[in-house]
Amino acid sequence: LDALLTALPIAYLKWDHNRDLAPLADAAGRPSGTAQVAGTLALLARLRAAHPDVEIESCAGGGGRIDAGMAQHVHRFWTSDNIDALSRIAIQRGFLAFMPPEMMGSHVGASPAHATGRVQPMGFRAVVAMTGHLGVELDPAKLSEGERAALA
């Protein structure tokens, strides 16, 4: 990673690690999950020190990696791949109970939502996404004039 971040003009890194820790035990049968987490935090600390201008987002919803330890090393968290606005209200409420809004990646998604199939107006999707670090996860060229106006 250091070589890539040094050689290429990379400004953003998404750290995506889902829940499974492998292996769960070392060769002697001792639990190794704690060591794996400590290693991840140490690696991220080295990357941040060597590349302070690279923005790091932890994709943590599936990995259960939203905690104070990880927050020291990333700029924000992606809380869930479910970007259905109605579903995101509960997800974001839980996140905001212990983390600041600027650390929450929150995107306006397409309608119907890919995870639920729900159709929701652009205004609702945008307002829900604005509670965090706002992003747009759809093709703006496919929006109607009304949707573009609501998003703007």
Regions found by a protein language model. Name each.
Residues 147-152:
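Short, intrinsically disordered, charge-balanced linker/junction segments flanking boundaries
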